[in-house]
Amino acid sequence: MTKPNPNKQTVELNRTSLYWGLLLIFVLAILFSSYIFN
């Protein structure tokens, strides 16, 4: 009964890392588009 807890933590960590990755790509896309249009 103690094993599901670390698994939940790893899943939450993967979700947060995925969100940070999408946010980073979004920011880079904005910077790249602003660099092109300027």
Swiss-Prot record:
TM stretches of this protein: 17-37
Family designation: Belongs to the PsbL family.
Keywords per UniProt: Chloroplast, Membrane, Photosynthesis, Photosystem II, Plastid, Reaction center, Thylakoid, Transmembrane, Transmembrane helix
GO biological process: photosynthesis
Name of protein: Photosystem II reaction center protein L
Membrane topology: Single-pass membrane protein
A GO term from the CC aspect: photosystem II reaction center
